[in-house]
Amino acid sequence: MTKNLLVELGLEELPAYVVTPSEKQLGEKMAAFLKENRLSFEAIQTFSTPRRLAVRVTGLSDKQSDLTEDFKGPAKKIALDSDGNFTKAAQGFVRGKGLTVEDIEFREIKGEEYVYVTKEEVGQSVEAIVPGVVDVLKSLTFPVSMHWAGNSFEYIRPVHTLTVLLDEQEFDLDFLDIKGSRVSRGHRFLGKETKIQSALSYEEDLRKQFVIADPCEREQMIVDQIKEIEAKHGVRIEIDADLLNEVLNLVEYPTAFMGSFDAKYLEVPEEVLVTSMKEHQRYFVVRDQDGKLLPNFISVRNGNAERLKNVIKGNEKVLVARLEDGEFFWREDQKLVISDLVEKLNNVTFHEKIGSLREHMIRTGQITVLLAEKAGLSVDETVDLARAAAIYKFDLLTGMVGEFDELQGIMGEKYTLLAGETPAVAAAIREHYMPTSAEGELPESKVGAVLAIADKLDTILSFFSVGLIPSGSNDPYALRRATQGVVRILDAFGWHIAMDELIDSLYALKFDSLTYENKAEVMDFIKARVDKMMGSTPKDIKEAVLAGSNFVVADMLEAASALVEVSKEEDFKPSVESLSRAFNLAEKAEGVATVDSALFENDQEKALAEAVETLILSGPASQQLKQLFALSPVIDAFFENTMVMAEDQAVRQNRLAILSQLTKKAAKFACFNQINTK
């Protein structure tokens, strides 16, 4: 006999961008939980709205499958003494399995007999396993979490309700100080609290309270409503996939409607209007059958059609305020002089440790000269490139880009064309930002491609030079995206430019504003984007291995595979954190990392130093990883009993030297502080 399980977590409004990933994660972790507990099922369906995450398991087995396991013990010659009695080795083996020597049998393997015992575990009822779903909810991970009401725990948002039902049976489980019940919350304004009658009645019980729990159904409702508006008004509505996904995660009961604005605003560049509608107001764009932008928009309210006219007027009023700004900036920006704006970039900080935007542009210009030759640009292309490099950031000081920063580069192209620059120069200014995402559009022109590469390379090298290097999951200056952009552009244009030779050439350049440093780190960083051979290996593990000092591809692949293999084991997180802490502190070591045993003040220092001195990574990657993880207790004991940053400089440097020697050896496998254990 099978059953149906429902788990729903009611929360404060979730950020739209975390709803879908969290729903998916809940389904995956529930499936893993059931598999781990030997519970078969027919299907898993997940649900989500801005205020809830839920999962339903149908066709769930009413009990665990029985488990039969065979365990191999010592050889017979060790298990029996000369009198044929079981030795302590045999007795200890069976005792550890919860059995007795009477359960022992002997099996022959390759000519020798060994002790074997068979252990049978009768499966528990599903009711006994269900309380474990609380651990599934606790295991969910989020980009950010928060505390509330003075509690010590944290979660993505405050939790209000927990419903766990096995068919009609209610489980009053505890989760983050919330007592489970069959009560769920309806729509914030249109609905009320309701009791979920059974696992199978979930959607209908909520539907009565103006909540569409199935995101696929909400999406289809939005699409159908938009199509209906299209047919009614004879227009074309752009259903942007990303915008649709965001909107459906902002509403529990969607109702689409069309609003309008004064046609005079259509004189403003289309990109300004589209940005105002899509990016700022979450509106869908409306066009005529020929693709021409119309003075209309589509929005989706979180509710039904009651008082919809008031809602439309409110949305129109908000949009007009945005469009007024756009119209004003478009008119006023045309009075500006490009050369004046470029000069003012001397007063705009690129980064406080790096200098001004103008200095960044000058360095980029010098890089373009080097790249133009390597890329084989024509004389005309080289001239256009030089002009574009001289002015390409000017639009950052325009009013339009100040208000709508998404339009940087786009407005630069429009303003340069109005100023009489060549189309190639104008296009390059727009294209130098490309790609803006991992799979984003690439430049089409050679001039734009070279400018994009040069701009990104100076950005990468400049930040690395002042020590602003990404670590773990932290990349505040989007250097990974910039590096990936460089690699993608080079590949797309078929330019056979050796990256190591190119970087060497760049480090040979001399600038008044900055000296490039940290070349080895830059090479590692770029190589991480070029080398995609690690496939679906988690990103942080890729980076850890590629940041190491061993550049043999076969070794890197094997190391990544070994890390993935053990990443779910219990000792992975504490072991990596121990090594990561050592890596982070070792960066503070000064000069040559030599260790003086005369400066040791405790046994833990001595133990770690000796362990590091005798550490020789050998064998396959899995064996090397075991060697490194075996150091975790020694490292932890060192940190627990040793103040690394001691006041005595000699003692401090000696302790840092121990860590430096450790990390130098460990880096031959991977830089463990690049692995995210959070």
Curated annotation (Swiss-Prot):
Q: Which domain of life is it from?
A: Bacteria
Signal peptide (from-to): none
Any single GO CC term annotated in Swiss-Prot or TrEMBL for this entry: cytosol
Short name of any one Pfam family annotated for the protein: DALR_1
Q: Which PROSITE patterns match?
A: AA_TRNA_LIGASE_II_GLYAB
> Into which EC class is this enzyme placed?
ligase
List the subcellular locations: Cytoplasm
Q: Which UniProt keywords apply?
A: Aminoacyl-tRNA synthetase, ATP-binding, Cytoplasm, Ligase, Nucleotide-binding, Protein biosynthesis
**Does ATP-binding show up as a keyword for this record?**
yes
Q: Name one GO molecular function term.
A: glycine-tRNA ligase activity
Q: What is its main location?
A: cytoplasm
Which reaction does this enzyme catalyse, per its entry?
tRNA(Gly) + glycine + ATP = glycyl-tRNA(Gly) + AMP + diphosphate
Any one Gene Ontology biological process term? Answer: arginyl-tRNA aminoacylation
Q: Does the keyword Ligase apply?
A: yes
UniProt xrefs under InterPro entries: DALR_anticod-bd, Gly-tRNA-synth_bsu, Gly-tRNA-synth_heterodimer
Describe its assembly: Tetramer of two alpha and two beta subunits.
Which PANTHER family does the protein's record reference? GLYCINE--TRNA LIGASE, CHLOROPLASTIC_MITOCHONDRIAL 2 (PTHR30075:SF2), GLYCYL-TRNA SYNTHETASE (PTHR30075)
Q: What family name appears in the similarity comment?
A: Belongs to the class-II aminoacyl-tRNA synthetase family.
Which HAMAP family does UniProt cross-reference here? Gly_tRNA_synth_beta
Its protein name is Glycine--tRNA ligase beta subunit
